Amino acid sequence: MPIITKTFNYTGQLQLADLPAGANTLTLHIWGGAGGAGGPDSAGDGADGAAGHYVTVTDLDISSYAGSKSIAVAIGGGGKSGELAGNANGGANGQSVTQYSGGVGGNSGPVSVSGSGGGGGGATTVTLFESGQDF
């Protein structure tokens, strides 16, 4: 069977895709959402947020799924950057359409000296199911 590549990007929505008939293995390259940058402070810009975690799954055996197969992909969004303001809230968390959103960044101090923390990136999930099943 030929190798077929499908790329999913963050949309804020669950994305569904049917796998080709006869597919028996999957190889996945998965990135989580990146963290937001820290807010600037009185000495300069805040640091960049960390990249989303990367995972590779090679030759995942999906032959036990009897019928046609589909995947549901939820791409994690990036965290929002912090800001410089007295009592500023931390950056918003990166969203996921699953319950695995990133954490909210820490708040700034009471005066405009330290910036708030950037929000954490959302998780990316991939779920395999038999076509025709409710997901």
Where are these regions (language model features)?
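GGW-centered surface loops in extracellular recognition modules
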Residues: 1-37
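Glycine-rich strand-loop-strand elements at beta-sheet edges
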Residues: 11-13, 30-129
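Short, intrinsically disordered, charge-balanced linker/junction segments flanking boundaries
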Residues: 131-135
